Amino acid sequence: KFLDLPKYGCINVHASLLPKYRGAAPIQYAIIKGEKESGVTIMQMDIGMDTGAMLDKVVVPIEENTTMGELHYALREQGAALLLQVIDKIAAGTAVAEPQDNEQATYATLLDRSMEHIDWSKTAQEVHNLIRGFNPAPSTFTKLPNGKGLKIWGSKMTDKNSAAAAGTVIETGKHSFFVACGEGVLEITEVQPESKK
């Protein structure tokens, strides 16, 4: 009954376009899943997990190389502005609550540490999305032939193809290197050796 105590109820700012990506990690999952847009939803709170009726939304585009950190910042700015607008509507009695379509719901569950390890057998796009979605936190890594870890902070899609085994470095440049994936080749642009800053 706590949610019923405030005169105007309780509201929440959620970093996704509900009912998609209910849960704890909506920003990361939007990028990992290759979404082209995300956004912020202001909703009424109820006893469910991000299931309350929606009061307003704002859409934020996700570009090819947008990272989780960049999207987080954009959502924060847009969400703060939207929250003020919704509060004004609630105070004026003009806010309209739209129930969520539960059949369209997807979930952004807690991130698992095992997800940080790059599986090069996936497509270049999937690996690129993971790297972007985990930058700056919790980050992604791969194991070198000597057993040491290498954090991967930046990548770019390419139009290259290779018959080399997934995970093989097929080409090096002055400021990057290219890795064969299960499908396609990914350019790695920023790394951090294990135990190095």
Name the predicted role of every residue range.
Residues 20-22, 33-35, 90, 96-99, ...:
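A short linear-motif detector with a strong N-terminal bias
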Residues 1-107:
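Donor/substrate-binding cores of folate-linked one-carbon enzymes
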Residues 36-39, 50-51, 56, 112-114, ...:
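A generic structural signal for well-ordered coil/turn residues at beta-strand boundaries
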Residues 121-197:
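An anion-binding loop in the catalytic cleft
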